[in-house]
C-alpha cells in the first residue's frame, strides 16, 4: 500500500510499523485470545504492557529515578487545569507567553490561582520570536513557571529549556512539551514537571503523559478531583481509575519503534533529533531562498516540528492545497487563527515526505511565479 504523507498537526501520523503491528495483534494479543481494548487494566496481560511502556519511555527520555511517569487522560488542554490544581499552593504562577497554547494555559490557570502572572510575552511581535529569558519578570515565591516549549500553531520552539536557577529563580519549571516530546533529549535538571498529549509524537489521542518530580507530589489544592491528583495517580501506578489502555499500548509500540531508529551512528531519541534537524533544515532552506513563500518566525526559534508558511499571493492558497492533495500531501492547511499553510513534520514523517513536499512547492512556484 502506498500511503500519502500526512502533515496533520494532531492527531498526527503514526509510524507504519506501529500500525501494522497493532493491526496484526488486534484480535489476539500474544495468544491471549483478547484484543488489548478488551483487557482488564488490572490483568497480568495489560500490566505487562504498561510496565514495558513505562520502562521504555524512562530509558528513551533518560528520565531520572526521582521523577514519576504518569499515564493520564484529558490531553494537554486538561493539564492546563490539572497542573495548577496540583502545584499552585503559593497562589502565584508565572507564565511565559510564546503562542496560542501558552495563552490558553494562563487563561485556564486564572480559574484556580490568585495571580496568573505574565512574566514575558511575544504577543507584540505576533508570536514570531521568543522573549529572551534575561528579560523575564519572574515573581518571587511563585509556585512554578510555565512554558510551552513548542508552539504548534505559531511554529516557535525553545531550542533549549531555560535555566531558571541561572535567572535567580527557585520555582520549578513546568513544560508543555506536547508537540515535540521524544523529538530531542530533555535536560531534566531544569524541569520540575513536563506534560503532553500523545497524539503528535507518541500515539493516538486520548493519552496524556505527565512526568513529575517526586517532591512536587502531595500539594494538590483541596478542590482537586482525586483522579487528577498527581500523588494519587502516582501511588496507584496510573490505575486509580481505568487508564486509556489502547493509547498506552500504541504508545508502547511507538517507544519500541523509537528505540529501533538509527541515524549516523546514533540511536533512539538522539537519532530522531538528528533526523528532525535534517528535515527542518531542508524545508527552511528552500523557503528562505524562495520569493514565492515565506516563514515569519525568527531563525533562532523556528520549530523543527510545526512549520507555518505562507504564499505571498494568498489568492493561490486553494490551488496549492488542491494540488498537494493530488500529490498525496495531506492536511497542509494552516490553523484558522493564523491562516496560510502548516507542515507538521513529527517523528513519524520520513525525510522523503519533506523532500516530496519541497519538490511540489518548487514546481508550484515555477508554474505560478
Curated annotation (Swiss-Prot):
Where is the major localization of this protein? cytoplasm
One GO BP: pyridoxine biosynthetic process
Could you name the Gene Ontology cellular component terms for this entry?
cytoplasm
Q: What is the disulfide pattern of this chain?
A: none
**Cofactor requirements of the protein:** pyridoxal 5'-phosphate
Q: Supply the HAMAP family for this chain.
A: SerC_aminotrans_5 (MF_00160)
Function as written in the Swiss-Prot or TrEMBL entry: Catalyzes the reversible conversion of 3-phosphohydroxypyruvate to phosphoserine and of 3-hydroxy-2-oxo-4-phosphonooxybutanoate to phosphohydroxythreonine.
Query: What's the protein here called?
Result: Phosphoserine aminotransferase
Q: What is the lineage of its organism?
A: Bacteria, Pseudomonadati, Pseudomonadota, Betaproteobacteria, Burkholderiales
- Report the gene name: serC
Amino acid at each position: 500500500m502506498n500511503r500519502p504523507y500526512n502533515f496533520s498537526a494532531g492527531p498526527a501520523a503514526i509510524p507504519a510499523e506501529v500500525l501494522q503491528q497493532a493491526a496484526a495483534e488486534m484480535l489476539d494479543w500474544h495468544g491471549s485470545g483478547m484484543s488489548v481494548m478488551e483487557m482488564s487494566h488490572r490483568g497480568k496481560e495489560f500490566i505487562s504492557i504498561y510496565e514495558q511502556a513505562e520502562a521504555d519511555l524512562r530509558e528513551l527520555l533518560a528520565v531520572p529515578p526521582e521523577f514519576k511517569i504518569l499515564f493520564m487522560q484529558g490531553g494537554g488542554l486538561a493539564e492546563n487545569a490539572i497542573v495548577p490544581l496540583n502545584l499552585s499552593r503559593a497562589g502565584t504562577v508565572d507564565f511565559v507567553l510564546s503562542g496560542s497554547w501558552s495563552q490558553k494555559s494562563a487563561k485556564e490557570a486564572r480559574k484556580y490561582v490568585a495571580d496568573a502572572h505574565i512574566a514575558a510575552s511575544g504577543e507584540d511581535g505576533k508570536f514570531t520570536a521568543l522573549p529572551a529569558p534575561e528579560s523575564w519578570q519572574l515573581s518571587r515565591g511563585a509556585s512554578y513557571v510555565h512554558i510551552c516549549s513548542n508552539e504548534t500553531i505559531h511554529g516557535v520552539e525553545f531550542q533549549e529549556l531555560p535555566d531558571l536557577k541561572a535567572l535567580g529563580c527557585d520555582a520549578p519549571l513546568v513544560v508543555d512539551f506536547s508537540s515535540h516530546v521524544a523529538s530531542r533529549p530533555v535536560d531534566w535538571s531544569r524541569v520540575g514537571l513536563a506534560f503532553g498529549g500523545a497524539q503528535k509524537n507518541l500515539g493516538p489521542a486520548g493519552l496524556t503523559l505527565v512526568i513529575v518530580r517526586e517532591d512536587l507530589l502531595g500539594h494538590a489544592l483541596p478542590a482537586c478531583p482525586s483522579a487528577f491528583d498527581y500523588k494519587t495517580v502516582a501511588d496507584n501506578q496510573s490505575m486509580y481509575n481505568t487508564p486509556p489502555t489502547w493509547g498506552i499500548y500504541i504508545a508502547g509500540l511507538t517507544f519500541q519503534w523509537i528505540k529501533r531508529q538509527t541515524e549516523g551512528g546514533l540511536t533512539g531519541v538522539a537519532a530522531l533529533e538528528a533526523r528532525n534537524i535534517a528535515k527542518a533544515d531542508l524545508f527552511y532552506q528552500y523557503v528562505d531562498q524562495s520569493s514565492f513563500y515565506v516563514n515569519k518566525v525568527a531563525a533562532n526559534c523556528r520549530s523543527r516540528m510545526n512549520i507555518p508558511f505562507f504564499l505571498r499571493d494568498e489568492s493561490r492558497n486553494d490551488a496549492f492545497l488542491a494540488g498537494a492533495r493530488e500529490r498525496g500531501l495531506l492536511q497542509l492547511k494552516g490553523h484558522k487563527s493564523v491562516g496560510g499553510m502548516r507542515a507538521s513534520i513529527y517523528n513519524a514523517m520520513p525525510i522523503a515526505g519533506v523532500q516530496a513536499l519541497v519538490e511540489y512547492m518548487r514546481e508550484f512556484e515555477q508554474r505560478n511565479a
